[in-house]
């Protein structure tokens, strides 16, 4: 299983104060020196709430690890990434809403202009991945557009797992739709969410598409996904950075890697 580390929230801390620290390149090399991280993931948002264009340029210039850039189909973002001399190892196209706190679901594959953006990256020799819900129609869209990799949105699975097996439902930001569900209901829905991820990962494999997954994964809920043999990569960020605030980035990475790479 490949471990993709999302370091957006290193930059979130910097941007809160509009200052120079923490340094994203220091985070990059801490990750690299653990010898456990396979790629670095960043999300270049339209609103630039964390990662900036300059961060992209600096990372691509010196990173010893592959860089996966998440982005929308915004024309300005697409033009910027297609113009880069140093190319990312892949671009993962994600849905984006300026009012969202974080990505809320998989990509709408009927989105106008999506096919053109995929072709633009392919024409520049950049691998494309699509961040999708684990649905067959989305996989068929990927295959029709010669997309060789997808990342399944694991938010539904992760939220259900957290509601059932942690104190998430008692926290200030508890998900209202899950608070009133019984443990039996949560367990059944969690089981179904896992089965859907497993089924679509297998479907992707038979289509010749590499299946990755991410969103909301943490030290507790990630373990079950390791039982899906056709999943090849997990992208995890917020949970690792949250633990890093308390124990340090290196230790937080190593603890996650111990779970993923056992």
Swiss-Prot record:
Cellular component terms (Gene Ontology): cytosol
One GO MF term: pyridoxine 5'-phosphate synthase activity
Pathway involvement of the protein, from the record: Cofactor biosynthesis; pyridoxine 5'-phosphate biosynthesis; pyridoxine 5'-phosphate from D-erythrose 4-phosphate: step 5/5
Keywords in alphabetical order: Cytoplasm, Pyridoxine biosynthesis, Transferase
Coiled-coil annotated residue ranges, if any: none
Reactions the enzyme catalyzes: 3-amino-2-oxopropyl phosphate + 1-deoxy-D-xylulose 5-phosphate = pyridoxine 5'-phosphate + phosphate + 2 H2O + H(+)
EC class: transferase
Purpose: Catalyzes the complicated ring closure reaction between the two acyclic compounds 1-deoxy-D-xylulose-5-phosphate (DXP) and 3-amino-2-oxopropyl phosphate (1-amino-acetone-3-phosphate or AAP) to form pyridoxine 5'-phosphate (PNP) and inorganic phosphate.
Protein name stated in the entry: Pyridoxine 5'-phosphate synthase
């Amino acid at each position: 299983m490949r471990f993709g580390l999302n370091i957006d929230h290193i930059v979130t801390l910097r941007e809160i104060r509009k200052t120079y620290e923490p340094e994203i390149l220091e985070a990059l090399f801490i990750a690299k020196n653990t010898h456990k991280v396979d790629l670095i993931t960043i999300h270049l948002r339209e609103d630039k709430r964390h990662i900036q264009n300059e961060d992209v340029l600096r990372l691509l210039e010196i990173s010893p690890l592959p860089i996966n850039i998440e982005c929308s189909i915004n024309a300005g973002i697409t033009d910027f990434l297609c113009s880069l001399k140093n190319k990312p190892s892949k671009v993962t196209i994600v849905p984006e809403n300026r009012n969202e706190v974080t990505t809320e679901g998989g990509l709408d594959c009927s989105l106008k202009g999506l096919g053109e953006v995929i072709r633009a990256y392919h024409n520049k020799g950049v691998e494309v991945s699509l961040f999708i819900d684990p649905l067959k129609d989305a996989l068929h869209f990927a295959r029709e557009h010669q997309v060789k990799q997808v990342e399944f949105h694991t938010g539904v699975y992760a939220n259900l797992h957290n509601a059932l097996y942690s104190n998430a439902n008692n926290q200030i930001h508890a998900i209202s739709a899950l608070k009133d569900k019984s443990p039996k209901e949560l367990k059944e829905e969690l089981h179904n969410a896992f089965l859907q991820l497993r089924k679509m990962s297998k479907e992707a494999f038979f289509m010749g598409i590499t299946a990755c997954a991410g969103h909301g994964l943490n030290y507790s809920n990630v373990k079950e996904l390791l039982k899906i043999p056709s999943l090849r990569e997990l992208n995890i960020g917020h949970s690792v950075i949250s633990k890093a605030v308390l124990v340090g980035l290196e230790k937080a990475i190593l603890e996650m890697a111990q779970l993923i790479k056992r």
